Amino acid sequence: APSGLVLAIDEKGNELVVQNADKPFVPASVTKIVTAWLAMEVLGGDYRFETRFYLNGDRVLYIRGGGDPFLISEELAQLASELVVAIGKKPLSGIVLDASYYPSDIRIPGIEDTDEAYDALNSALAVNFNTIHAVREGKTIRSAEKQTPITPLAISQFRARGPQGRGRISL
C-alpha cells in the first residue's frame, strides 16, 4: 500500500524524516484519534446524533436523519416498538425519508469508489453503516444477521456485487 510520512520537524520547522509528504493519501486510522478528541472537545461526551420522527395529519411519517452513525437494525426494532406506542396501530399512508441534514454533494479526497464496507459513504440517514451483510447460497441470498431483515434492494445489490458465501458490501 502507498504510504507517506513526516516523522520529525526541528525547531526551525525543517522536516527531518520525510517520505512522499506532498502526495495525497487516505488518512490513516491514527487520524481518528484527533477526530475523536476534537468531537469530545466541541460536542462533549453526552452528545448524541438524533433521528427525528414526525407524523402529519394525513398519517405520513417523516423520518429525518441527523447523521447517527449507530443507526442499526437493533435500534430500528426498538424505535419501531416506540413508534407504535406513540402513534398507534392505525396504518400509515406513507413514509418520507429525509437525508438532507448533510449536503448530498460531499466529496472527500482519497475516498475510493469500491464495494468494500470500509469505503461506504456516510449520510444523514445511514442504516447499518451503509453496508449489506449477506450470505449467498446458490441462487439464494439471505441476511447474514438474524436481527437484520433483507430488502429487495439489498438482495439485488448483493447479487450484483457480493462475494460467494458470506460477505459485506457498501451501498
Q: Residues of each region from the PLM?
A:
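Beta-lactamase-like hydrolase cores
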Residues: 1-27, 43-46, 82-89
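Generic, low-specificity signal for short hydrophobic/alpha-helical stretches with a mild N-terminal bias
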Residues: 3, 15-18, 35, 65, ...
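Active/ligand-binding-proximal structured segments within catalytic/core domains
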Residues: 25-39
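Conserved serine DD-peptidase/penicillin-binding transpeptidase domain
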Residues: 41-171
